[in-house]
Amino acid sequence: MRPMLPILALAAAAVPLAATAVARPETPKQALTAAIAAPTRTPTNVARDKYRHPAETLAFFGVKPSDTVVEVWPGGGWYTEILAPYLARTGTYYAAAPLPNGAKGVQALQARDAARYAKVRIAGFPAKPGDATVPDGGADVVLTFRNVHNWRFGGADQAQAMFDAMFRMLKPGGTLGVVEHRLPEVRDAAAEEKSGYLKESSVIGFATKAGFKLAGRSEVNANPRDTADWPQGVWTLPPSYRLGDTDRAKYAAIGESDRMTLRFVKPR
């Protein structure tokens, strides 16, 4: 039996080493990968990862697990399913939308999985009297995905007011990340009124007028097959398919819209 003692000693010594390896904290990249790969995500949302590129997009915006992040107008909660668990341990996630209707998608997620979304904070944006709000200067990152065209439909002044409000939300040095359907710069600006597409120069104009500095552009959400001249605007393409079965295979082959991905910073 004596020859077994060194082997047993080695095995015993390996236990704390293994425990140390298990206890090693995740890197931000690992935490984001885990959030994106979570089996709790809605399957139809997962199917759109190939168009929305959440890992690359959030990495470009520099979102860290310890950040206070405001998602403006989260809609059905596509990014909520990723951001809320990613930020749950050491960060904060705000879903900011017109209340009560604008938060219904996020509230549905909370009803489905209360534990996973327990720390989500819902705020009015624009806020009405009595709404919870995001404190001015309280956010490290503000994100909005494919919403600027909706604000533009209300007029340039409304869109500008939204950018002004997002500027106030951020700490000095904070980041604004914008993803939006992209209209080619050579097109008539009138197309912005109804197509759902905006020129990059228009979005940059709203942001810089609010006080932001453009810090970077990414083509991660680009789609060169999208010519942005469809009969029902951007909603002709998936996932909306506003024409129903008419030319559906054609539009499916094109895929989701061509999108700008812009990172702005609030000067210190």
Question: Which residues does each predicted region cover?
Answer:
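Class I SAM-dependent methyltransferase Rossmann-like catalytic core
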Residues: L32-K64
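Conserved class I S-adenosyl-L-methionine
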Residues: P65-G75
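A short glycine-rich, Lys/Arg-flanked "PGG" loop and its adjoining helix->strand segment in the class I
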Residues: A84, Q158-P172
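S-adenosyl-L-methionine
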Residues: G105-D131
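A short acidic, Gly/Pro-enriched loop at the edge of an enzyme's catalytic core
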Residues: A132-V142
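Conserved beta-strand signature within the Rossmann-like core of class I S-adenosyl-L-methionine
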Residues: G173-H181
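Conserved Class I S-adenosyl-L-methionine
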Residues: A189-R217
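C-terminal lobe and adjacent flexible extensions of AdoMet/dcAdoMet transferase-like proteins
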Residues: D247-R268
